[in-house]
Amino acid sequence: MIDYKELISAAIESLKKAHKNQPKDLTYGSAVLTKKGNIYSACNYWSYTASLTLHAEQAALAHAAAHGETEIIAIACVGTEDNKKEQFCHPCGMCKQLIYESSIDSKIDIEVIMANLKGEHISKKISELVSHPWPA
């Protein structure tokens, strides 16, 4: 079993750099671990239109791809809203779909690490989180 402490720490550090939204000030961070052992992290980037907001998980996947790495083993997510409730951060449906598509392309069932700011986490394979994927 892989120790995801470094991956979660990278996600938490990215969260601290997130482009905050108003008025709620919600921030998210994410980090991916590639098959080559590299970690790429990113944060959310909020848009005033909301529909143009870039999610942390999307940005982390794009960050890895920008470095030529698309074989993702694991992705960690953290968020401030979830931590107010002392819960683990779960990716939204749109991010689950994108992670699932990455999984299809790489043929790796990506481990999704849902963490809080304390570093505590739960994890599930993306195949467990996406009950009705598209394309099926």
Q: What do these predicted regions represent?
A:
Residues 42-43, 60:
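N-terminal cap/recognition module
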Residues 44-46, 50-56:
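Compact, glycine-rich, soluble single-domain proteins
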Residues 27-35:
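Short beta-strand scaffold segments in enzyme catalytic cores
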Residues 56-77:
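Short, solvent-exposed cationic patches
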Residues 55, 59, 94-97:
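Short amphipathic alpha-helical face segments that pack within enzyme cores
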Residues 2-21, 70-136:
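C-terminal binding/interaction regions
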Residues 24-26, 45:
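Active-site segments that bind and position negatively charged phosphate/pyrophosphate groups
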